[in-house]
Design a protein with these regions (language model features):
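Phosphodiester-processing cores and adjacent nucleic acid-binding clamps
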Residues: 18
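Extracytosolic ligand-binding ectodomains
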Residues: 2-13, 22-380
Length: 380
């Protein structure tokens, strides 16, 4: 009798657990939670966490609550693949990540093999979506678009000037630098210096000496905020006054913290600041109430979760392939970063880059400000 009761209780607990699991849908967030890009990892993690909290409060997705597993890829491709395999083993269906293009690409292959849909809020290398994969999307733009904006700006405002181009040898950094050079070439310009550095280095004195010798009037940087900040600081230390210009990889307040006062005047390409959009007002207030400023990729990560929810509800399914089909269909999604729709590759259909300049704010802090009409020459 006791054995029968024990078996009955065990069966009851198993059914309860199964019922709980069936009432949930598992997401993963993969990004650099630690390492040199940890500030961006925090943006992504907070963006996903807040979106999940808000969606769950409103009833979840198709009546199921979202659970999230967080994976730290440390901006390393091998670790990204390890995280992807762990997510697959744990039954994750949807992933928001990764940050670095060079991590996203091998990770997305693991996700495809395991039927998992991935949306990156930050990986901008064109090849992320040029591999004819059903499962990879992004909420950001592409480097060929970003490079076109940067190169066109250089041709218009630095015609006849000397341009040095420096990159960090990564898929993202070198790719962005090369796309910018292509756009410059269309305007009859080419760099006087083209150099690659190693991520993680601290001493860029040799590089700065080359920049100084080149007589560069502008230094274009293809890379992230840590190395970019160090390069600017060391340029100023050696008396190089040429402004820096970079891409969305420097959109973090950490750039100014690392680079110091010398980052003022830095030019940058990035999407229109989503914090200023009416659609984001309530969510931005939620973040600020928690003492977290939703800069850079925070809202792009939040938007990724919103897209999955809306596509799943339109598809009336939580099967990743059916959700992907709905996303590829041209459906419009209402998100905190504005309306989005996707092409067959998984790219957003809007051109998403404008010009910014880093300048001192009334509170004394140096941060990035969108230039009216993308003309930073009019900014005082």
């Amino acid at each position: 009798m006791m054995r029968t009761m024990t078996l009955a209780l065990a069966a009851g607990f198993a059914l309860a657990a199964a019922g709980t699991a069936s009432a949930q849908v598992k997401f993963g967030m993969a990004g650099p939670i630690t390492g040199p890009s940890a500030a961006t990892g925090a943006q992504m993690k907070n963006g996903v966490a807040q979106a999940v909290e808000d969606i769950n409060k409103a009833g979840g997705i198709l009546g199921k609550q979202i659970t999230v597993e967080y994976g730290d890829d440390v901006s390393d491709p091998k670790q990204g693949v390890s995280v992807a395999n762990n997510f697959a083993a744990d039954g994750v269906r949807f992933v928001i990540g990764n940050y670095n293009s060079g991590v996203t690409m091998p990770s997305s292959e693991v996700y495809q093999e395991n039927g998992i849909l991935e949306i990156t809020p930050a990986s901008t290398n064109p090849q992320v979506t040029e591999r004819k994969m059903w499962n990879i999307f992004r909420t950001c733009g592409r480097d060929d678009q970003q490079g076109q904006v940067a190169g066109a700006y250089i041709v218009k405002h630095f015609k006849g000037k000397k341009i040095a181009v420096v990159h960090d040898k990564t898929t993202y950094g070198k790719g962005l630098a090369d796309e910018t050079i292509k756009a410059m070439a269309k305007g009859g310009m080419k760099p006087v210096l083209y150099e690659g550095i190693n991520v993680g280095e601290k001493d860029y004195s040799a590089l700065v000496s080359k920049i100084k010798q080149s007589g560069a009037d502008l230094v274009y940087w293809g890379g992230l905020y840590t190395e970019g900040g160090l390069i600017v600081r060391q340029m100023r230390d050696q008396g190089v006054k040429a402004p820096l210009m970079g891409g969305d990889g420097i959109t973090s307040d950490e750039f100014a913290q690392v680079g110091g006062p010398g980052v003022e005047g830095t030019l940058m390409t990035y999407g229109p600041d989503p914090r200023n959009k009416p659609e984001a007002k309530a969510v931005v207030a939620e973040f600020r109430a928690k003492k977290f400023e939703p800069e850079a990729y925070t809202l792009y990560s939040y938007a990724g979760v919103q897209v999955v929810k809306q596509a799943a509800e339109a598809a009336k399914s939580l099967e990743p392939k059916k959700v992907a089909e709905k996303m590829h269909s041209g459906m419009h999604f209402k998100t905190v970063i504005g309306d989005l729709s996707y092409d067959k590759k998984g790219d957003i259909t809007r051109l998403d880059y404008v010009m910014y300049v880093w300048k001192k704010q009334p509170d004394g802090k140096i941060s990035y400000v969108e230039c009216p009409g993308s003309d930073c020459s009019k900014m005082k």
